Amino acid sequence: MWMIAASAAWILLLRMADSAPPSSREHQGSSVPDMKMTGFHLVETKDGAKLWEIWGDAAEVFEKEGVAKVKKISRQVAVTLYSEQGQLTSLSDRATLNMRTKDVRLDGNVTATAEPGSSLQTDSLDWSAQERRLFTRSPITLVKGGLLSRGVGMEAETNLERARLFGRVRSQVLQHRVDELRRDLPIPRKGGS
């Protein structure tokens, strides 16, 4: 029901923006949004499959630029990205949606967790809808399978199963993983035969 109401509000607001007199839209400039919304939830699908979902306290739509900017007021913006490899659920202070390409950019205190349990932290993260891949040029911390890696810049599958850090990479095995590995090692025997 909520999704239907949000969709109806979105369509109504788009029609209202289209019906505004041309002179009023011309004077707005690029810094004034064509629409403002609160309690924002948007789902993008392609051929019946979800590409992403975005939830936010507030959103502004800039039709001429073809972007929607979602921001937090009290709760972080939540974005779930879907691909054949799996899904990634993330939180950030802001998200920008390119309404033409359907790409999503997350900015400010970005944290994300993938289905298999991998996670990341960074300042900004881009998701390409066409490639269904993640990208960043910012410093990043990636935790995957008991390994903590830090670096600058990353390219990864949506589920973080395959990730490549680009520069200043440092990795360490997390202590709980070291303990697990030690338990799995065979116990050395003393003496002969």
Regions flagged by a language model, labelled:
Residues 1-193:
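Mature-chain termini and adjacent capping regions
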